[in-house]
Amino acid sequence: MLVLGIESSCDETGVALYDSAEGLVAHALHSQIAMHNAYGGVVPELASRDHIRRILPLTRQVFEESGRLLSELGGVAFTQGPGLAGALLVGAGMGRALAFALRVPAIGVHHLEGHLLSPLISDTPPAFPFVALLVSGGHTQLMLVSAVGQYTLLGETLDDAAGEAFDKTAQLLGLGYPGGPALSRLAAAGDATRFALPRPMLNSGDFDFSFSGLKTAVLTLVRKQGLGQAADIAAAFEAAAVDVLVGKSLAACRHAAANRLVVAGGVGANARLRERLTAEGGRAGVSVFYPSLEFCTDNGAMIAFAGAQRLASVADRVARASDLDFAVKPRWALASLGPVE
C-alpha cells in the first residue's frame, strides 16, 4: 500500500510517500526556523499560514520526485495531534480532502507515535519489545513498546521537557532560536567540569524527569557569572541533562528487562546524548537505536510510516474509508492509543 504522510503539528511542514512493499519512496520538508527566529520562538498564527502555503507544493514535489501517481495512493495519514491546533488543522484538512477525493481511507496519526516508530524506517530496525526515550521540545517520556500501538508509560517529565530546557537555557545564554542546536555547538567549546549543576531526580528511584530546577540553577549561575563563561555554562548544562537522560533510560531498560532502547525526537540528534547512550548502553548490554538525523525532527516520513502500519489492518481501512471527521487533538496521551488489530 502506498501511503501519503502529512506532518504540520508545529513549525515544520513535512510530506512523504511510504510504500509497504518498498519502504520510504520520497519525502520533502520545509522548516519555518528562519521565519520564527525573529520572534525567539514559534508564533502559532504564522506557523499555520506557512503550512497553508507549503503543503501543496511539497505534495507535488514528492510525487514528481518518486514518479508515482495520485491514483496509486492506498491511503493518507496526517498528524492529528498533539500540537498547535491551527497548524494541525491544515494537515488534517488537506489529508481528509485528498482522501475523500480519491476515495481512499485517511487516518489521523499521533505525532509521538510517529517519532517513536521512526527508527523502524531504517534498514536495521529494532525488534519488539523495546524501551523508547521520547525526547523533544514538548515531551520527555520513557515508554515500554511491546508492538505497534502497545505502549506502557514508564515515566515522564513533571515540568519542563528536555528540549524546552535546552531552548530556555540557550535564551539565558543569549543564543538564537532554535536554542538546542546552538547551545550544543557552544558547549563543544566549553569545560563541563567548570561549574557544578544539579542532576534533578537522577536517583529518585522512578523513571520521571524534572528539568525546571536545572534551568533555575543555570539562571542563578548566569546572574552570578555573566556571559563571559557562556561556553562552560552551556557544557555544564548539557552534561547534567544528558546524565539524567542516560541514567533514567538505562534504569528503565533494567526495570523492563529490555536489551533494546530507541531514542526519538529532536533532542535525539544531540551528539553528546548519542555518544553517552551508545557507550553506556554497550557496557550494560543494551543496543541503542536512533532515527537518521533527518528524521529526528518533525517530518512526514514518520507519519507516513506510522499511518501505513495502522492502515495495514483491513478492518481499519474499511472503517476509515467513509470517515470525514478532521477534528484534531492538541492534547493527546500516547498511552491512550489502541493496538493494531
UniProtKB/Swiss-Prot annotation:
Keywords: Acyltransferase, Cytoplasm, Iron, Metal-binding, Transferase, tRNA processing. GO terms for biological process: tRNA threonylcarbamoyladenosine modification. GO terms for molecular function: iron ion binding; N(6)-L-threonylcarbamoyladenine synthase activity. Its EC number is 2.3.1.234. Its cofactor is Fe(2+). Substrate binds at residues 134-138, 167, 180, 270. Binds 1 Fe(2+) ion per subunit. It is an enzyme of class 2 (transferase). The keyword Cytoplasm applies. GO terms for cellular component: cytoplasm. Pfam families: TsaD. It catalyses: L-threonylcarbamoyladenylate + adenosine(37) in tRNA = N(6)-L-threonylcarbamoyladenosine(37) in tRNA + AMP + H(+). InterPro entries: ATPase_NBD (IPR043129), Gcp-like_dom (IPR000905), KAE1/TsaD (IPR017861), Peptidase_M22_CS (IPR017860), TsaD (IPR022450). SUPFAM superfamilies: Actin-like ATPase domain. Its main location: cytoplasm. It is found in: Cytoplasm. Fe cation binds at residues 111, 115, 298. NCBIfam families: gcp_kae1, T6A_TsaD_YgjD. Required for the formation of a threonylcarbamoyl group on adenosine at position 37 (t(6)A37) in tRNAs that read codons beginning with adenine. Is involved in the transfer of the threonylcarbamoyl moiety of threonylcarbamoyl-AMP (TC-AMP) to the N6 group of A37, together with TsaE and TsaB. TsaD likely plays a direct catalytic role in this reaction. Belongs to the KAE1 / TsaD family. This is tRNA N6-adenosine threonylcarbamoyltransferase. It comes from Thiobacillus denitrificans (strain ATCC 25259 / T1).
